[in-house]
């Protein structure tokens, strides 16, 4: 049984159009979680001003900029970086887990109660968080050296959360299987991940150059939009993996 991009796009479109209200609700909820974390843990204003003024970009090297900082500024930058990583991981884990649980709940022939699905989500989130931490770590290392290794790793590891949701493999096996399947179906997985990255880049560029509305509101709208598109990517990849298991 051959799997085509067109077939996957049609299946994804039908699912998303049918469940768009729930997807938007989950996306908004994930965006509010990011905002709540930002409100609860306020980073140093001076460090934020350095980043927002794009001094990182104007500097010849990030390492040169870090070396020119005082010990206090270095500590604050480290704290800010850790805070942003955990904010990203928490919101991503919640979004991923919620969308995967939604798909599993709707595609399960045995009708399960909402309470059962919520319990499954709560049990799934800790292992998903650890997996996201591992995959994000390797992807960021890839982006640190060159852009292409980071993009390539993003494609290879894209299926690992979906494989984990089937509860048949441990974390390492999920990563190994994701790499193996993605390499064999690079056109299907790679196209979707690259499309998501392009959408993310366009949205970030457009909203970061918008000065009419307040920054907090822009941050909220940007997060909601990115979460919706990321949810669509998850639906696409989940459908692909289901068809892959049947083939």
Curated annotation (Swiss-Prot):
It is found in: Cell membrane. Keywords: Cell membrane, Membrane, Transmembrane, Transmembrane helix. It is a multi-pass membrane protein. One of its GO terms (cellular component) is plasma membrane. InterPro entries: UPF0259 (IPR009627). The chain crosses the membrane at residues 20-40, 82-102, 114-134, 137-157, 188-208, 217-237. The keyword RNA-binding does not apply. Pfam families: UPF0259. Belongs to the UPF0259 family. This is UPF0259 membrane protein BUsg_265. It comes from Buchnera aphidicola subsp. Schizaphis graminum (strain Sg). The lineage of its organism: Bacteria, Pseudomonadati, Pseudomonadota, Gammaproteobacteria, Enterobacterales.
């Amino acid at each position: 049984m051959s799997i085509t991009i067109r077939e996957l796009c049609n299946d994804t479109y039908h699912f998303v159009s049918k469940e768009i209200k729930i997807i938007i609700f989950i996306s908004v909820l994930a965006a509010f979680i990011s905002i709540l974390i930002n409100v609860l843990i306020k980073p140093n204003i001076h460090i934020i001003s350095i980043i927002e003024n794009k001094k990182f970009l104007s500097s010849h090297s990030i390492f040169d900029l870090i070396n020119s900082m005082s010990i206090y500024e270095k500590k604050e930058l480290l704290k800010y970086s850790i805070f942003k990583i955990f904010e990203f991981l928490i919101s991503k884990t919640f979004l991923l887990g919620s969308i995967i649980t939604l798909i599993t709940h709707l595609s399960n022939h045995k009708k399960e109660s909402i309470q059962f699905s919520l319990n499954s989500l709560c049990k799934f989130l800790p292992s998903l968080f650890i997996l996201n931490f591992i995959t994000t770590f390797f992807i960021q290392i890839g982006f640190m050296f060159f852009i292409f290794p980071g993009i390539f790793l993003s494609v290879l590891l894209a299926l690992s959360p979906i494989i984990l949701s089937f509860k048949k493999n441990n974390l390492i096996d999920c990563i190994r299987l994701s790499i193996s399947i993605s390499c064999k179906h690079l056109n299907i997985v790679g196209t979707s991940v690259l499309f998501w990255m392009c959408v993310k880049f366009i949205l970030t560029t457009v909203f970061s150059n918008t000065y009419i509305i307040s920054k907090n509101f822009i941050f909220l709208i940007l997060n909601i939009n990115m979460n919706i598109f990321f949810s669509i990517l998850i639906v696409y990849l989940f459908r692909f993996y289901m068809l892959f298991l049947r083939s």
